[in-house]
Amino acid sequence: MVSEKQRRRVLGYLQKGQEQGAEVVLEGGAADVPGRAGFYVKPALLAGSLDNVAAREEIFGPVAYLAPFRDEEEGIRMANQTDYGLANSVWSSDLGRAARVAEQLVAGNSWINGHNLFPHGVPYGGVRKSGLGGGVLSVETLFDYWRSLSVVRPL
């Protein structure tokens, strides 16, 4: 993590998630790396109901959350029931299905069979309460600093 404060924040989410009933599939926690100073956290995997802070908020740490769903439609609906929308990954051997799902997810970024891939010039950014909006690292970024104004006066 970038700081002790962020490490404590991530560990707090793990604790709150468990207190709210999340099943621990892979236990995370603070990690010490011999000979390396830093604020390390072991990856964690939690599972259960989406009615859980660890599933509902952006943790910005090595934490994943699994929630079961019956079919594609329910999975999309569940994924979109959030106040956030920074990014998602869709993983499937059926690329057509993965593309169909990714196009229906409300987020600034959707990746298929990968994560955190940013080719140059591709806009990224979040929606809803995530990030600063779309368009970072692209021509769309300029629109964040641009105020369009038309002034019309008689001659």
Regions found by a protein language model. Name each.
Residues 14:
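Conformationally flexible catalytic loops at phosphate/diphosphate-handling active centers
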Residues 7, 21-22, 60, 73:
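Low-complexity, intrinsically disordered short peptide segments enriched in small/polar/basic residues
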Residues 1-11:
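Short beta-strand to alpha-helix junction loop
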Residues 33, 37-155:
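Conserved C-terminal structural/oligomerization subdomain of aldehyde/semialdehyde dehydrogenase
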Residues 20-21, 37:
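Generic structural motif recognizing short loop/turn segments at the entrances and edges of beta-strands
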Residues 21-31:
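Short secondary-structure junctions
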